[in-house]
Curated annotation (Swiss-Prot):
Xref: Gene3D superfamilies: 3.40.50.880
Source taxonomy: Bacteria, Pseudomonadati, Pseudomonadota, Gammaproteobacteria, Enterobacterales
Example GO BP: L-histidine biosynthetic process
Coiled coil: none
Localization: Cytoplasm
Protein name: Imidazole glycerol phosphate synthase subunit HisH
Assembly information from the UniProt record: Heterodimer of HisH and HisF.
Gene: hisH
Organism field: Shigella flexneri
PANTHER family in alphabetical order: IMIDAZOLE GLYCEROL PHOSPHATE SYNTHASE SUBUNIT HISH
GO molecular function, one term: lyase activity
Domain called Glutamine amidotransferase type-1: residue spans: 2-196
One GO cellular component term noted in the UniProt record for this chain: cytoplasm
Keywords: Amino-acid biosynthesis, Cytoplasm, Glutamine amidotransferase, Histidine biosynthesis, Hydrolase, Lyase
Amino acid sequence: MNVVILDTGCANLNSVKSAIARHGYEPKVSRDPDIVLLADKLFLPGVGTAQAAMDQVRERELFDLIKACTQPVLGICLGMQLLGRRSEESNGVDLLGIIDEDVPKMTDFGLPLPHMGWNRVYPQAGNRLFQGIEDGAYFYFVHSYAMPVNPWTIAQCNYGEPFTAAVQKDNFYGVQFHPERSGAAGAKLLKNFLEM
């Protein structure tokens, strides 16, 4: 199977690459349209700011390429947020617009921001991405912005208020947490995605 990690220039790809390799796949890191469009599975990781990430997406001519993908795509952390419409970061950043939902800063309920560490995730029953993962399993988060719960939410987390921990629209999936840092539950989620 052809697994590709999209080289957005704004992510530490080694941990994602290693996590995929543990399942017996050799992912390619690329932004070449021919390689990306022929991938069976595509990963869209991201760390840092939405502005820097979208600058890289445009500079590397990835905007239309990502939107043209028909294979399963998994956005991780900031990569999930990029699937949204607009981020409140940096006075507003236009995103890919695949999911018609904004990404606001998380509300301060007296809890520290960024939301960092282990938290429970509650998936919708029956979603293939969470098959075999117990309800309320712990995943590892590091973020200050989050997509609200919306019609495309497939898993929720609570940090002062509920937010989207995972999302799906058609072939595009996103997880706000880091599956590559989330132990057995994260490994199972990656396996589920790779075996779709």
